[in-house]
């Protein structure tokens, strides 16, 4: 059982490293960072508490929103999805990501108080 799991993981890593464009790898690293940051915030909330509740919610909403926006960007700039997003260039997708991210963080900063 464990040998097949190791085989699947190693094959996945080989294919990911060989066939994924560098832009997507960079975006995946950003997604991993956001995921770990959100998990760390949630763990802190469970262990220590949520005394400044608005601050916790703002940080966590920022992580979740940023993750969703980055996943949308990844989907749009993936070369395999080019047929689905014919009218949207990677530069336009990135500009949309920056605009939406700016709006998200303005809302988050407003929520902090």
From Swiss-Prot:
Pathway: Protein modification; protein glycosylation. The chain crosses the membrane at residues 31-51, 53-73, 93-113. The keyword Acyltransferase does not apply. One of its GO terms (cellular component) is oligosaccharyltransferase complex A. The modification N-acetylserine is found at residue 2. It is found in: Endoplasmic reticulum membrane. Residues 2-30, 74-92 are cytoplasmic. GO terms for molecular function: enzyme activator activity. Keywords: Acetylation, Apoptosis, Endoplasmic reticulum, Membrane, Transmembrane, Transmembrane helix. One of its GO terms (biological process) is negative regulation of apoptotic process. It is a multi-pass membrane protein. Subunit of the oligosaccharyl transferase (OST) complex that catalyzes the initial transfer of a defined glycan (Glc(3)Man(9)GlcNAc(2) in eukaryotes) from the lipid carrier dolichol-pyrophosphate to an asparagine residue within an Asn-X-Ser/Thr consensus motif in nascent polypeptide chains, the first step in protein N-glycosylation. N-glycosylation occurs cotranslationally and the complex associates with the Sec61 complex at the channel-forming translocon complex that mediates protein translocation across the endoplasmic reticulum (ER). All subunits are required for a maximal enzyme activity. Component of the oligosaccharyltransferase (OST) complex. OST exists in two different complex forms which contain common core subunits RPN1, RPN2, OST48, OST4, DAD1 and TMEM258, either STT3A or STT3B as catalytic subunits, and form-specific accessory subunits. STT3A complex assembly occurs through the formation of 3 subcomplexes. Subcomplex 1 contains RPN1 and TMEM258, subcomplex 2 contains the STT3A-specific subunits STT3A, DC2/OSTC, and KCP2 as well as the core subunit OST4, and subcomplex 3 contains RPN2, DAD1, and OST48. PANTHER family: DOLICHYL-DIPHOSPHOOLIGOSACCHARIDE--PROTEIN GLYCOSYLTRANSFERASE SUBUNIT DAD1. This is Dolichyl-diphosphooligosaccharide--protein glycosyltransferase subunit DAD1. It comes from Homo sapiens (Human).
